Amino acid sequence: MDGNGRWATARGLPRVVGHRSGAEAVRRVVEASCELGVKALTLYAFSWENWDRPAAEIRELMGLLDEFVRGEIPTLLANRIRLRAIGRLDQLPADVLGNLHRAIAQTASFERMTLTLALSYGGRQEIVDATRRIAERVRRGELAPEQIDEALFVQHLYTADLPDPDLLIRTSGEQRLSNFLLWQSSYAEIYVTQKLWPDFSKEDLVDAIAEYERRDRRFGRTAAAHA
């Protein structure tokens, strides 16, 4: 979800206007994803590094997040969309976190699509947190070091109940992972568009999925073995 600030700056508008337009793009993409049959959609809404932004901008973003979560509950309920959140959520303001937890609880039983908001999230931080949880289990005698493998590690990630992403879309021409789902994106197809996030439309999502479907995903195997 890159480009909110640049979108606003290019129009001579305050950055908060770009963030509000970005929230509208979220609504479009969530609706389009449901229509297209996407089962899991994860949005990088607020990174761990975003805490380094000016305090005033962080307050605006937290207010916008709270407004979005409260305002979208009817849509989530009507479309049977399950809401989740990943990240170091205890860093969020208490009122925002409370409303987020309520929305998550209200939609917990839905299965049409899972919408995950990555908030106060960093891929490196997630791996560190998973490692700490495993180390604590070893310390308590619940695990032996030789029992630790990839499958066990995955169980301690924030995304333990989610599939690995098939497609990673980067807007505004960015060509890096930016600390997003580092473990999970090992074999994700990366699609880069020059569109800034506030301009991202259903048609852009369709184009990204179409490009994904044209790719030959080998997962490290040769073409012959894959066939």
Regions found by a protein language model. Give the residues of each.
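Flexible, compositionally biased loop and terminal segments
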Residues: 1-227
